[in-house]
Amino acid sequence: MKKWLLLLVAACITFALTACGSSNSGSESGKKKLIMGTSADYKPFEYKEGDNIVGFDVELAKALAKKAGYEIEVQDMDFNSLITALKSKQVDLVLSGMTPTPERKKQVDFSDVYYTANHMIVSKKDSGIQSLKDLKGKTVGVQLGSIQEEKGKELSPEYGFKTEDRNRISDLVQEIKSDRFDAAIIEDIVAEGYFKSNDDLQGFVIPDAKAEEAGSAIAFRKDSELTDKFNKALKEMEDNGELEKLKKKWFTGEK
């Protein structure tokens, strides 16, 4: 009798554990909650406000997910870990100001581009840095795994500067202010946010940068059904003006 009861209890525990696991790792078509990976150091796209992660990308993700029949849970991690987390199914999608470069497209799929920005050289106002030529012999910071890191490597041989990487944009800004970096390459809309709270910083847009080099898109696993669903929702938001309203809200302060 005791043996029978023990077997019954063991069976119940096994069933319960299996049920819990499947509720978190079910197929994309069967679950209603999606985990969004992001690097919450990229204001106004994604950043921490108290205990919450907010920003343009976060609000966009929630709006798109709602149209597609899902809810979004946001998970913060270093930018260079995002694609690995997506491929290993730790997250279901990535919104983090990520550019769909050819190298990234080999690993994951992307939505249509939802925002295009420019690269900016950020430095102290008293640095004497006013153009790319002024970077000769300087140390320029870039975010690890970012499109700005690629841009830095592309420009450094021509303009004679060296690059160093950091995990977070806030780290780059701190290194400039501490004189460990002479400058950094940061997306313009993000840099503008730092200028507002750091009046000792300045910046200029890198000239002749191709627009598609700085376009942002949503990353999904290869052959994910979510890609088409989110593209459809994104097209709807573009057509009805919702996307433009979000851009004005987060980038210009317009309601």
Curated annotation (Swiss-Prot):
Organism listed in the record: Bacillus subtilis (strain 168)
One annotated GO biological process: amino acid transport
Protein name: Arginine-binding extracellular protein ArtP
Keyword Ubl conjugation appears in the UniProt entry: no
Residues covalently joined to lipid (S-diacylglycerol cysteine): 20
Coiled coil location: none
Function summary: Part of a binding-protein-dependent transport system for arginine.
PROSITE patterns per record: PROKAR_LIPOPROTEIN (PS51257), SBP_BACTERIAL_3 (PS01039)
Phenotype on disruption: Cells show impaired growth on arginine as the nitrogen source.
A GO MF term: amino acid binding
UniProt record similarity statement: Belongs to the bacterial solute-binding protein 3 family.
Location in or out of the cell: Cell membrane
Keywords on record: Amino-acid transport, Cell membrane, Lipoprotein, Membrane, Palmitate, Signal, Transport
Signal peptide stretch: 1-19
Membrane topology note: Lipid-anchor
Lipidation feature positions (N-palmitoyl cysteine): 20
A GO CC annotation given for this chain: outer membrane-bounded periplasmic space
